[in-house]
Amino acid sequence: LDVQIVFEDGSLAVLNKPANMVVHPVKSSQSGTLVNFLIFKYRDTLPIIYDKFRPGIVHRLDKDTSGLIIVAKTKLSADSLIKQFKSRKVKKVYLALCIGNPLENLSKIIGKPGINMLEDNILEIKTNIRRNKINREMMEVCTNDGRLAISRFTVQTVYDLGKNYKLSLVSCEIETGRT
């Protein structure tokens, strides 16, 4: 499996999870998961987090997301990391390459409930979301139920590729872990 170990000591490992890799085995994807890698690499030495399918895993990344994932190697580090993620002491920042320039369309969304422009051109979206009742893989904004999602976006660079085609490098800070 194509998983790079970026850092490792006696307490934890930081892994670079590639995009399109499922973290936990599911019915449609039993092999090639991050859990499969962890079981192969560390055998039975990782602490069990919640159940046997989370060996050392204290947070998650979606299948389509590449990035760093922290794996606890001891019960003590697992407890500490889980506490830090729950209390939001860990800052989660992603980079995304987007089609177009989000700043050009802000007038269409600024002022809608939960959408605010903060200083330094930071766009904050703070609203409740829930799973779409028809397509359970999608999330939707809702007003009276769901769970709070807080995300902040900053356009880092806009690449003008000509012929009215632009790409933007956007920094995304996910405060709640829900998007």
Explain the meaning of each model-derived region.
Residues 1-179:
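RNA pseudouridine synthases
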